[in-house]
């Protein structure tokens, strides 16, 4: 009994101890200020994270896209080099000569038709009015086809006058479509209308208009290449409504007498044209580091003429220029020969700048070599002020015989060697300089710059 009572007493003591240990835990009251602060901090961190993510995406997205889907580079534009060509008249004369030789080998001498007899037969051919109509009708069809390669280029500039009125000025020139590089349609035009303008607008022969940008310019000739993005033009339009002109050759023996058509603005207005022949190709125009052949025609035009000369095979053989005619022939249309321009047009079409040395010169003739002992090379007639050549010590009368590793025997070879260089390149020039009665070799290291 006593044990059971002790046990009960212990149980009661344990229960009282447990009751004593039970506590009521109250919830901590919400601190609204702390909660608001944490909410603001969390929201701010989320905004900052979003901004960082957006910035990172904007920066890396083009890099990743170009890495995954690399953009195709424009194709390099290359024009085929000229080969010795014969004019149609030369081909006809050669064929007649061949026929005469064949007839001489198969006929007795008395049956051979002499040239005088041929001229007499030709002089008996009389053209009537219908023949002239047919000739000019054929020329009109030819011009319509060639005009598919011609465009009008408009340079637009905006300005504000004294009264805060916006003025818009426009300058126009003609242009010819010369190539496309897979991304752009390339057009050769005058530089002055597109120099430092706000917008360039190209109007094609059918009236379609498109925006263009300056690809590159050539200060020495006053020419430029502008580009129209292909994705801004309709595919059917590209296939059916325009034609890329073919650059021919002006390096034709006896080119005088070759029939030509002047398109663009030979009369000083866009869309004008002229028919005629080349009367001379003997004159040249010297410019910085190059020389151009001038094609003179019998087409009476404007002193502000522009455009191109086509031969009757549909090829561009000259780029019309002004101010290059003789003083007594100022209104006769003349043009730069396309052969001398091809490398310049090629560099502009690829967006490459021209390296500048600052020399004008001529070839050393056989007479000068034999009589005066002048070595063959590029004879320097002028060194331009403050040019890299002048600063290096090149003088008038020097003869360039080496350009780097290349041997130079003419001024054309010097020009072509320079065209293969870029501004900033260095080159070693080998020259021969007269010292008393003999020429001595000298070498100059020159860094090329850009013509300004």
Segments and roles (model prediction):
Residues 167, 347-417, 425, 430-452:
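PDZ/PDZ-like groove recognition
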Residues 120-130, 259, 319-366, 449-452:
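Interdomain regulatory linker/hinge segments that flank or connect interaction modules
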Residues 1-150, 154-157, 162, 236, ...:
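N-terminal targeting leaders that route proteins to membranes or the secretory/organellar pathways
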Residues 162-170, 217-221, 232-239, 281-295, ...:
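Gly/Ser-enriched beta-turn/beta-hairpin loop segments
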């Amino acid at each position: 009994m006593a044990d059971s009572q002790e046990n009960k007493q212990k149980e009661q003591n344990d229960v009282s101890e447990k009751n004593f240990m039970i506590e009521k835990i109250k919830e901590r009251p919400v601190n609204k200020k702390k909660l608001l602060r944490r909410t603001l901090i969390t929201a701010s961190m989320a905004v900052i994270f979003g901004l960082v993510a957006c910035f990172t995406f904007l920066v890396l997205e083009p890099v990743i896209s170009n890495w995954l889907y690399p953009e195709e580079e424009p194709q390099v534009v290359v024009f085929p080099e000229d080969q010795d060509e014969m004019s149609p008249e030369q081909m006809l004369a050669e064929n007649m000569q061949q026929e005469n030789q064949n007839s001489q080998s198969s006929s007795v001498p008395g049956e051979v038709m002499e040239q005088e007899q041929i001229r007499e037969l030709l002089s008996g051919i009389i053209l009537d009015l219908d023949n002239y109509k047919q000739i000019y009708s054929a020329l009109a069809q030819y011009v319509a086809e060639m005009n598919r390669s011609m465009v009008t280029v408009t340079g637009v500039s905006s300005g504000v006058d004294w009264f805060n009125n916006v003025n818009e000025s426009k300058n126009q020139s003609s242009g010819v479509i010369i190539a496309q590089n897979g991304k752009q349609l390339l057009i050769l035009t005058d530089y002055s209308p597109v120099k430092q303008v706000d917008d360039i607008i190209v109007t094609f022969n059918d009236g379609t208009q498109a925006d263009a940008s300056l690809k590159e310019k050539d200060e020495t000739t006053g020419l430029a290449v502008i580009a129209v993005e292909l994705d801004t033009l309709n595919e059917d339009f590209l296939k059916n409504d325009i034609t890329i002109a073919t650059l021919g050759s002006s390096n034709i023996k006896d080119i005088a007498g070759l029939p030509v058509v002047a398109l663009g603005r030979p009369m000083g207005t866009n869309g004008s044209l002229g028919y005629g022949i080349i009367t001379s190709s003997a004159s040249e125009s010297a410019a910085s580091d190059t020389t151009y052949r001038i094609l003179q025609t019998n087409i009476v035009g404007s002193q502000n003429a522009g455009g191109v000369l086509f031969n009757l095979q549909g090829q561009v053989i000259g780029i019309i220029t002004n101010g290059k005619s003789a003083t007594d022939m100022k209104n006769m249309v003349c043009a730069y020969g396309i052969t001398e321009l091809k490398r310049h047009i090629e560099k502009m079409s690829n967006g490459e700048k021209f390296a500048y040395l600052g020399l004008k010169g001529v070839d050393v003739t056989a007479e000068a070599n034999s009589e005066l002992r002048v070595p063959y090379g590029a004879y320097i007639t002028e060194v331009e002020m403050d040019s890299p050549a002048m600063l290096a010590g090149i003088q008038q009368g020097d003869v360039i015989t080496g350009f780097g590793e290349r041997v130079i025997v003419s001024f054309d070879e010097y020009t072509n060697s320079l065209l293969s260089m870029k501004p900033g390149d260095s080159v070693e020039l080998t020259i021969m300089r007269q010292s008393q009665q003999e020429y001595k070799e000298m070498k100059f290291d020159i860094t090329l710059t850009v013509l300004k």
